[in-house]
C-alpha cells in the first residue's frame, strides 16, 4: 500500500544470518524481486560485542557462516542479478566500529568494497537484474537458475 500511494519503499537485508544457506539467500532474492520496492540495502552479518548474537556465536560458532570478503562479493553479485534494475541498491556492506566488531573484519572502506564488487561484476560480464524480467514499474520475477 505504501508504494501504491507514491511513497518510496525500501528493504533492508542482512546476508548470512545463522542457519541461512547460499541457496536460500538466492531464493530470497527472487522473492524480494517481486515486492514493490524502490530501494534495497544489503549488508553482511556482523557480530557485535555485548549482543545476544555474540553470545550465541561464542556458544555455537558452527551455526554461523562468516563470509570472507571475496565469497561475500560473489554472493552479493549473485543476489543482485535477481533484483530488478529499477530497485536502487543503497548499500552492500555495513561498517561497525572496530572496538565493537567481533567479526568479520575485512579492513575495507565502503568505497574499496564497491570498487572490488564492480570490478568482479565486470570480470563476470554481469549486471543488476540480469536474471530478472521486469513486470510493471518496480516489480519483477527472476529466472530460477538453481
Which role does the model predict for each range below?
Residues 1-4, 27-31, 71-74, 78:
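Alpha-helical scaffolding segments of alpha/beta enzyme cores, especially the outer helices
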Residues 1-14:
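Radical SAM/AdoMet-radical enzyme domain recognition
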Residues 5, 34-35, 82-83:
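Alpha-helix C-cap/termination motif
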Residues 14-19, 47-49:
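Conserved radical SAM core fold
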Residues 18-34, 99:
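Catalytic cores of alpha/beta
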Residues 31-40, 44:
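Intrinsically disordered, low-complexity linker/tail regions enriched in Pro/Ser/Thr
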Residues 39, 46-146:
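Auxiliary Fe-S-binding modules of radical SAM enzymes
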Amino acid at each position: 500500500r505504501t508504494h501504491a500511494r507514491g511513497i518510496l519503499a525500501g528493504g533492508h537485508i542482512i546476508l548470512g544470518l545463522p542457519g541461512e544457506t547460499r541457496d536460500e539467500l538466492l531464493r530470497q532474492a527472487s522473492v524480494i524481486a517481486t515486492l514493490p520496492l524502490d530501494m534495497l540495502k544489503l549488508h553482511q552479518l556482523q557480530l557485535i560485542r555485548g549482543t545476544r548474537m555474540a553470545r550465541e556465536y561464542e556458544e555455537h560458532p558452527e551455526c554461523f557462516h562468516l563470509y570472507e570478503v571475496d565469497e561475500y562479493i560473489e554472493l552479493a553479485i549473485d543476489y543482485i542479478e535477481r533484483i530488478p534494475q529499477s530497485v536502487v541498491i543503497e548499500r552492500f556492506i555495513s561498517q561497525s566500529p572496530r572496538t565493537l566488531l567481533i567479526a568479520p573484519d575485512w579492513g575495507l572502506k565502503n568505497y574499496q568494497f564497491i570498487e572490488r564488487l564492480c570490478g568482479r561484476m565486470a570480470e563476470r560480464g554481469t549486471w543488476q537484474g540480469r536474471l530478472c524480467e521486469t513486470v510493471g514499474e518496480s516489480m519483477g520475477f527472476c529466472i530460477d537458475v538453481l
